[in-house]
Each structure stands twice: as structure tokens, then as C-alpha cells.
Amino acid sequence: WDIGYVSTPIKEYIDQVDNKELRILIPGAGNSYEAEYFHNQGFNNVTVVDISEQPLKNIKIRIPSFPSLNLLYQDFFDLKGEFDIIIEQTFFCALDPTLRQDYVNKIHDLLSEQGKLVGLMFDAPLNTEHPPFGGKKKDYKTLFEPKFNLKTIELAYNSIKSRAGKEVFVNFMKK
């Protein structure tokens, strides 16, 4: 799961974003190399939430200038706030599939008007008893379409080698 750096699809997406003041959330982020990359690119409003405290401590060690107030040790489903972009990078697949509708609802609640869920989801069966749980593109469409305009849900052309052909890049805008 932890590849040790920001994944290419996420990096290439954020490199196209000019507004450094956007409020960005990375849920279930683990060591969040995405947050480190965004911070180093000048994004000022990046928030990381994780149910495990150690990865948040690791982020602060790696990036001493990262605002401590934006490293939230709590359950994603209890989070309050409003964000312009929520980054999906191996959080959805870590959740028990019975929580997927709750995830969609919570993402929708946390996004601002015109807010976006952007990131990667596995388009492969993977595991059924433990994370990472896989999924199918068609199921994601069914799950997200009631609350989101599905701008992009395509096989990621720039996945890392070990995930090539197994993940879709998504860009869903809040309805």
C-alpha cells in the first residue's frame, strides 16, 4: 500500500492545479506522501486525517513545517469541515465494503459546492476478507452517480508498475 512517494496519477493531477489556497483533505492517509508533495508545492490548506496516530507523527517528522492543526488523529466519519478537493489514495479500499455508502455520503457532506473527489480506486477484485478490498468500475458508477457528476472514471494510464491495469483515476464533482 505504502509506495514511499506520491503516486504518479495524483502528482500529475495536482501539478495542474493553480490555486494553492484550495482546501484539500486526504483521508485515511497513512504516511501521506501526497500531503508532503502538496505542501512542498505550496498548497497551504492541506488536511490529513487518519485513525492511526503514528503515520501523522511520521508526517510531522518528515515535514516539520506542516501545520500540526492539519494533522487530525480521528475517525474520518466523525470529521467536520468543508473541503474543495478530497484526495482518494488507498483509503476507500481499506474500508470494509459495508461502509462504502457511508463513505460516499461523508465525502459528499465534506465537499464544498463544486467540490471534487479526485484519486485512484482499484478496478480489480483483490481481497474479500481483509483490506485492500477491490472493486469494479461499474459498481463505483452505481455507488457515486446519485451524488456526483462523474467527470472522469478511466483506467489510469500512468499507474505505478505494480498497479498498472488495476486502478481507475476518478474525478467526481459534487452535485
Where are these regions (language model features)?
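A conserved beta-strand element that flanks and buttresses the S-adenosyl-L-methionine
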Residues: 87
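Short catalytic micro-motifs in class I SAM-dependent methyltransferases
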Residues: 90-94
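Class I (Rossmann-like) S-adenosyl-L-methionine-dependent methyltransferase catalytic domain
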Residues: 1-81, 95-175
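Conserved acidic residues
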Residues: 84
